[in-house]
């Protein structure tokens, strides 16, 4: 019998369900149906290898079930020792690769059921957990990875960690099932004051940004905190609400949305405002229609003013007026930069965040060698790259030697700026929602687009490119200047017109087309951009498309771009 997600949550005994029985069942590599929903709250998804699904069906075998495990790492900061431990877990239990997500977490792929508990225990032994990395709860909290702002980053990271801990589910189910903690007894032992019996209507995402860099794409988050810095001092945060990328093909009732900036709070008000926003969504969000359950739809259905008033009522204070701020771009700075305190930070480009040893590069081995130096810290970026942070000046040469030896500089030296700034979700073969390739197709599509860029003198012009295997938008494609959103195998919707600052949604330009048609559609647009762009302002491709009238703002009945008055 199939149960609704809401029923599964409310009857789960605080996310326990029958997970222990499912894990102990030796007959199948899968979990029971309801437990496949509940395990998400513990940080894992049941998947199968879709590349061999048909072959196994012909052999009358069940699918090659496996599990993805995602870490909860607020701000994506870990120590070298933790990196080495996670490397070992990937090698022993997963598919010999690590993957950096667009929310600064790690994903392990290919873990089989009988090794799931051992893998979870190994992750927790590193002082990292996976609780609430998935499911209808607050997910991993993003933090700006800008290596130049050492002191500000430390403050943002601490604030993000506070918010992450505050919004964790209170249930002890995770610790009982995976870490063999003694069972909880007593009726009041596990109250969920923030989430309640049914948790949230849908997933919830929070990001901390530090202008002028918007690497977290803060306006794609349900709740955003934009640091207001004056002469290096953090005054507090502007608050944004209602961002979200997910949509459904051909469904006019769903759409992506950029967030609204609603006011300003001080650091000591963070937990109160976060609680107020999350509980407002808990109580007002749409639980009847799951595709309409994200906070963005709650705002659009009830009205922004109504939602802000409710947030202020729950918080017990009124928001102050938003402070001026300005974003310059949403990408990463590659190579070495010197921090405020005289140490150095190296940002490495890791295509689609995949860290593995391949025929062309040994990224997993190379980063293992760097971690063995035991210096600084590792920061995952929201663009799926990696910062080796806090390196003493005298150690730079040693790291440079390892970077070159293991091919870790290949991404930084990519032939096009487009390749350096591209993102893609995992998609096939493991994601059950994927309609087309994304991560595996990214290198081929970038290579196919390169001759067009070179022909028009654009090889070193930054253009934000993102690929998504389905319309749910994990790679934040709807903010990209060029995006491919999977529609069917080998076919994509071509989306154009986002900007380099993560402040404007793109729009559908061509629907359900193949690579040849995509390139044919882009060729004349790139030619005009090369000839007519405003070089004095370093006009971006998406900005040019709008200024020239080649595309228009998307027809979504929602918030499409940031109110530019706030950027004064």
Swiss-Prot record:
HAMAP family: CysI
Gene3D superfamilies from the UniProt entry: Sulfite Reductase Hemoprotein, domain 1
Entry keyword set: 4Fe-4S, Amino-acid biosynthesis, Cysteine biosynthesis, Heme, Iron, Iron-sulfur, Metal-binding, NADP, Oxidoreductase
Chain positions recorded as siroheme binding sites: 474
Name the UniProt record assigns to this protein: Sulfite reductase [NADPH] hemoprotein beta-component
GO cellular component terms, semicolon-separated: sulfite reductase complex (NADPH)
Enzyme class: oxidoreductase
Documented EC number(s): 1.8.1.2
Family statement: Belongs to the nitrite and sulfite reductase 4Fe-4S domain family.
Species name: Xanthomonas campestris pv. campestris (strain B100)
């Amino acid at each position: 019998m199939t149960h609704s997600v809401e029923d599964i949550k409310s009857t789960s005994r605080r996310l326990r369900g029958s997970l222990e029985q499912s894990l102990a069942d030796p007959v199948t590599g899968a979990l029971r149906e309801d437990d496949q929903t509940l395990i998400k709250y513990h940080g894992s998804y049941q998947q199968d290898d879709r590349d061999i699904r048909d072959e196994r069906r012909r052999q009358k075998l069940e699918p090659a079930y496996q599990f993805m495990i995602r870490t909860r790492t607020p701000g994506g900061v870990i120590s070298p020792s933790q990196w080495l431990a996670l490397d070992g877990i990937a090698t022993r239990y997963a598919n010999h690769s690590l993957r950096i997500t667009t929310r600064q977490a790690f994903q392990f792929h290919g873990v089989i059921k009988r090794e799931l508990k051992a893998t979870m225990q190994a992750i927790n032994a590193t002082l990292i957990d996976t609780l609430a990395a998935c499911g209808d709860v607050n997910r991993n909290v993003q933090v700006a990875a800008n290596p130049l702002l050492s002191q500000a980053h430390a403050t943002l990271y601490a604030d993000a960690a506070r918010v992450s801990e505050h919004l964790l589910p209170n249930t002890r189910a995770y610790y009982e099932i995976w870490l063999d903690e003694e069972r909880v007894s007593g009726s009041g032992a596990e109250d969920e004051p923030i989430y309640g019996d049914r948790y949230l209507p849908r997933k919830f995402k929070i990001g901390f940004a530090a202008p002028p860099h918007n690497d977290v794409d803060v306006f794609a988050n349900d709740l955003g905190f934009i640091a207001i810095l004056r002469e290096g001092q953090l005054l507090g945060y502007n608050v944004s609400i209602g961002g979200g990328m997910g949509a459904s093909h051909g469904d006019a009732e769903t759409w992506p949305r950029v967030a609204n900036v609603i006011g300003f709070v001080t650091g000591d008000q963070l937990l109160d405002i976060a609680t107020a926003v999350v509980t407002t969504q808990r109580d007002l969000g749409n639980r009847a229609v799951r595709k309409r359950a994200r906070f963005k739809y709650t705002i659009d259905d009830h009205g922004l003013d109504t939602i802000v008033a409710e947030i202020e009522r729950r918080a017990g204070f009124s928001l102050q007026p938003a402070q001026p701020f300005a974003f310059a771009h949403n990408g990463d700075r590659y190579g070495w930069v010197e921090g405020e305190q005289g140490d150095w930070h190296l940002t490495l480009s890791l295509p689609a965040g995949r860290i593995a040893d391949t025929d062309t590069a040994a990224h997993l081995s190379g980063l293992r060698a760097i971690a063995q130096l035991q210096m600084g810290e590792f920061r995952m970026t929201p663009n799926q790259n990696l910062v080796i942070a806090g390196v003493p000046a005298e150690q730079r040469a040693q790291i440079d030697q390892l970077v070159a030896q293991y091919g870790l500089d290949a991404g930084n030296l990519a032939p096009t700026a487009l390749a350096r700034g591209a993102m893609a979700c995992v998609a096939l073969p493991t994601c059950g929602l994927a309609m087309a390739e994304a991560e595996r197709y990214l290198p081929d599509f970038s290579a196919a687009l390169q001759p067009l860029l070179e022909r028009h003198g654009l090889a070193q012009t930054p253009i934000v490119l993102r690929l998504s295997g389905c319309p749910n938008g994990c790679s934040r494609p709807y903010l990209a200047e060029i995006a491919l959103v999977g529609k069917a195998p080998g076919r994509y919707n071509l989306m154009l017109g986002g900007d380099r600052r993560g402040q404007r949604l793109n729009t559908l330009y061509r629907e359900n087309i193949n690579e040849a048609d995509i390139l044919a559609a882009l060729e004349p647009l790139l030619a005009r951009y090369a000839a007519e762009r405003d070089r004095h302002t370093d006009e971006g491709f998406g900005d040019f498309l709008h200024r020239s009238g080649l595309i228009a703002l998307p027809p979504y009945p929602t918030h499409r771009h940031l109110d530019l008055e706030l950027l004064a």
